[in-house]
A protein has these predicted regions:
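Ordered hydrophobic segments in well-structured contexts
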Residues: 50-56, 117-119, 136-138, 149-151, ...
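Generic detector of ordered, mature protein regions
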Residues: 61-64, 68, 103, 113-114, ...
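Surface-exposed, charged secondary-structure patches
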Residues: 83-143
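Proline-rich intrinsically disordered, low-complexity coils
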Residues: 27, 37, 59, 75, ...
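Core segments of small alpha/beta cavity-forming domains
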Residues: 10-104
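Short beta-strand edge/turn micro-motifs at domain boundaries
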Residues: 2, 140-181
Length: 182
């Protein structure tokens, strides 16, 4: 292993540890999401895992997913740009968000086993803006070589963690079923 490979591996492992969230169900409505234990948004890993779950729903039920994303973003809400960005990213790659669920790989067409599990982790820089209320978590994709970021913001008055920005919809390896070279 080369020196830089070792450094990259150390950075990817994280300084503060990792958190695994087992989702008992994939929410299909805002009411269902809010009723889930994770729906209180009191832990940053819960908000991150629910973001993945909601993005998985988007190709099937766009309006319900947008309502849930509005909730996950809290006071910030979704802008017109955010909605257009989501629509553009999901044109032909609805499998991307499923790649963040444990066990989803190109070989199984990003069909993860149940129960659905999301693991997030911190790196040495995750808490650089914690004094301002921001925390950056990382999530591995079964179809990418490097983890993706999700940035959360804490609302001190309620203790809730809201989605601030996500970089989860970048391109990944296509599923075997869609890969002409497989």
């Amino acid at each position: 292993m080369a020196l830089f490979d070792h450094l990259k591996q150390q950075m990817a492992q994280g300084a503060e540890g990792s958190y695994t969230v087992n989702l008992s169900q994939m929410p299909v409505s805002l009411q269902q999401l809010q009723a889930m234990p994770e729906g209180a948004l009191l832990r940053p890993e819960h908000t991150a895992a629910l973001t993945v779950a909601v993005l998985c729903l988007y190709p099937l039920h766009k309006e319900a997913a947008l309502q849930m994303l509005e909730y996950l973003q809290g006071p910030k809400g979704l802008s017109t740009y955010d909605k257009q960005f989501l629509q553009d990213r999901f044109r032909d790659k609805d499998y991307v968000p499923r790649s963040y669920l444990a066990g989803a790989t190109p070989q199984n067409n990003y069909e993860p086993p149940e129960p659905y599990t999301v693991t997030v982790f911190e790196n040495p820089y995750s808490r650089d803006q914690l004094a301002e209320g921001y925390l950056t978590l990382h999530i591995r994709s079964g179809g990418a070589d490097s983890p993706r970021q999700i940035k959360l913001r804490k609302r001190p008055s309620t203790g809730q963690w809201f989605l601030w920005e996500q970089f989860l919809l970048s391109d990944i390896r296509p599923p075997v079923a869609a890969d002409p070279w497989a």
